[in-house]
Swiss-Prot record:
One of its GO terms (cellular component) is ribonuclease P complex. RNaseP catalyzes the removal of the 5'-leader sequence from pre-tRNA to produce the mature 5'-terminus. It can also cleave other RNA substrates such as 4.5S RNA. The protein component plays an auxiliary but essential role in vivo by binding to the 5'-leader sequence and broadening the substrate specificity of the ribozyme. The gene is rnpA. It holds the Pfam family Ribonuclease_P. Belongs to the RnpA family. Its EC number is 3.1.26.5. Keywords: Endonuclease, Hydrolase, Nuclease, RNA-binding, tRNA processing. The lineage of its organism: Bacteria, Bacillati, Bacillota, Bacilli, Bacillales. SUPFAM superfamilies: Ribosomal protein S5 domain 2-like. InterPro entries: Ribosomal_Su5_D2-typ_SF, Ribsml_uS5_D2-typ_fold_subgr, RNase_P, RNase_P_CS. This is Ribonuclease P protein component. It comes from the Bacteria. NCBIfam families: rnpA (TIGR00188). GO terms for biological process: tRNA 5'-leader removal.
Amino acid sequence: MKKKHRIKKNDEFQTVFQKGKSNANRQFVVYQLDKEEQPNFRIGLSVSKKIGNAVVRNRIKRMIRQSITELKDEIDSGKDFVIIARKPCAEMTYEELKKSLIHVFKRSGMKRIKSSVRK
């Protein structure tokens, strides 16, 4: 993901947590905050130590980033997202993870996201 699409600072994460809306499924919690003045969407990732060791956590983050890269044209601009991975992500394949991410994005009200998973 490019720098313009990332949330890195703790205070930016906290703003999304406190002022944003959340949606969840079994694998992810997604917090969403509208920022009309911003030309791009931004995404922050959080994968807890409860999920597994560093290898597992980094694998999950890589798969989420790749999914976001493939979906970037369909994600609404002018929004900040924080994606929190839950324990079931550790055993998921890339296709399952992407499908679950699309599901939770649709629950959050994004209409442009398509259900098809490209292999």
